[in-house]
Amino acid sequence: MKPVIFAISLFLPLSFYSIVPAQLAKMTVGYGSISTNHFPAWMAKESGIFRENGLDMQLVYFRGGTTAMMALLSRETPISEVAGPSIVSASLRGTDVVMIAGGVVTSDQWLVTRPEIKMAEQLKGGSVATSIFGGSSDFLARMALKKLGLNPVKDVVIVQIGGVPERLGALEKGKVQAAMLGITEALMAQKKGFNALVAVSQAYQAAGVATTRRFIRESPDIVRKYVKSQIEAVHRIKTDREMGKRVLLKYLGPQDKEVLQKRYDYSSANDRLPPKQYPTLEGIKNILESLAETDSKAKAANPEDFVDMRFIKELDESGFIDELYKTGKR
């Protein structure tokens, strides 16, 4: 099933709810890619965790983190799941966007090339597929090209293609010479003879939960409930393998068992999806260092400027998170 884009909720929950209780806070939450970066939001929706915490959340897919960020800033989506670079860039422009939960805290993408391109030098003059300019895959593509000794501006043409499935499709059809792909898609491509030239692997705020400081002031209780739902969804991902795989199949589409298993194992690993969900300050620092090459504001910024950890800290210091994992509650 293909996702409905922009202002329409795209999926019905796996478990049935007949009537939305009046006390539930109803709102729209955006996310910017069809990837496991947004696994916690999908799980919170499908398992009923949002509703258990008094939230009726409509999940809306936007093509690319930049578009999802625009929806957040316009207040169409008071909370969004977006990539770290989008949050940092928007904040540097003077907006009041802020990250409230860490989501995925490591980079996970490979620069994959056509079978005939086996060395970086052969990529010169070719095109590289990303999702959207300013999004996570665009940011990581530039980092990957630099690691290969290529100039992202002069040596290649970076093009906007869309989500991971669209990028992989463009690569397979020869429309581009390279694409930024997640680890599972990179493995699939390698089996077909494509080449994974380089991985971008480091502390990196790949995706997280963002809102605005204004929304925190106006609706702190909703923000608190959302962060609690995020924590519980991450726990459910790590402790309910079968439910997790059903959710992945629903949002990512059909895939063979081996690919699904690898995707689930990778997506639920603690180093990628930490139980306590603090944003990674080191990962934000890495984003700032890259942006500082062209943005003087990034040079003077501190990673702490882009996060509000009060809600995570409340849950952590209360013992809630430790108790959740101690009891094994679902």
Cite the ranges covered by each PLM segment:
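Pocket-lining segment of extracytoplasmic ligand-binding domains
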Residues: 85-86, 165-256
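Short, glycine-/small- and polar/acidic-enriched structural segments
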Residues: 23-163, 167-173, 177-183, 196-203
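Conserved C-terminal helix/tail region of periplasmic/extracytoplasmic solute-binding proteins
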Residues: 289-330
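Secondary-structure end/capping motifs
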Residues: 219-301
